[in-house]
């Protein structure tokens, strides 16, 4: 996008919240859809000045388009045509281009917001693992937790109305409605969680969904700002993970004042709550009593239904005691367990013992769902016994080992924050033995014979980089090293949860 800034003067249009005139140029959508475009032509000195001109932009795009012809395969010949083009492909190109254009002002606001708050390493805040240190720090002081699924809008028009807060161009909104109607299956996308976050989902719909979530979370942001206990920068950052930084607060405050009397606002005077979200699932936790938590639930549901026009049922939001409830969140089973410690104190001739009970967040590997996932892709059976991967037997030995090592290291990397490593070691054992059985099947040999011939050094490939470095530093496993292996490690370079065999 930096290549276009000199020609489009984005700052001038950002001030007026208008999309620049390229929104209605057909060429930009074809270029946005084609990921194989040769970008080197943008680096050439074409001799254009920086003065804004539609003619200059059109000539520039025309020159780019001449090297990138649209080819429609013969397989699409039986589908509906639109002015000589495939209708579905044409609509998809339009949506991709529209999403790219709308994202530019948000990206500029993101950069300016990071510079204003002096956030240097903002990419660390995008990591999934950055949520767990926050939970470790806050959850031991809380009492109740509630799992909340993000409610979906009751109609696609709600998504358009939400985007209207940032896009003040009526023509662009009409074009957006046209694109929504072109996708005949988008109504099913609203109610299907797996399809929303699939890799094949249009980029435009993800943008609209994020704007909808921003509107939904603005109520919680208002409550957070009313609390004197949540003035830390760390908790505020997590509300900014959705990349909509300049959401105005007065619509939410106005709703509170108009829809609720002053007596009800007393319940929100000092809520002391925490909120985290990933994709369509969120966690709301607080230190209040069960009575206040239930009042929160009904008030928030009414606000979401009346203000954001989303359908949410109070009966599907369960409030659980944190000490007796296990959270299934981001692939971990998280729960609070007491950590007992005995302190011996002596004063003059008298000595006594003091028992300290501290709460600690316990993160466990979900062993049964993981074994089910491994069994689904034929690494083991339903009981967890390793089997050979028959579909990989035709590959080379190097490719087979590399695939297994890649999956094993990814799982070790992601579940390095587990409190108990026994379940993780079992998953590693399944993958190692499945790899050996696959190689033995390829060479028509038994596992024992194959290991004797190749040696047990094959299994060393499955060690992670951290384990290899520690084994070089500490040749003999000491007590300190074993204790370090049992400790939790959170990485700040994990941005998404991939499938087990997404590279297959």
Swiss-Prot record:
Keyword Transmembrane: no
Subcellular location: Plastid, Chloroplast
Keyword Transmembrane applies: no
Domain of life: Eukaryota
One Pfam family from the record: MatK_N
Annotated keywords: Chloroplast, mRNA processing, Plastid, RNA-binding, tRNA processing
GO BP, one annotated term: mRNA processing
Gene Ontology CC terms, in alphabetical order: chloroplast
GO molecular function, one term: RNA binding
Main location: plastid
Stored PANTHER family: MATURASE K (PTHR34811:SF1)
Function (record text): Usually encoded in the trnK tRNA gene intron. Probably assists in splicing its own and other chloroplast group II introns.
UniProt family annotation: Belongs to the intron maturase 2 family. MatK subfamily.
Name of this chain's protein: Maturase K
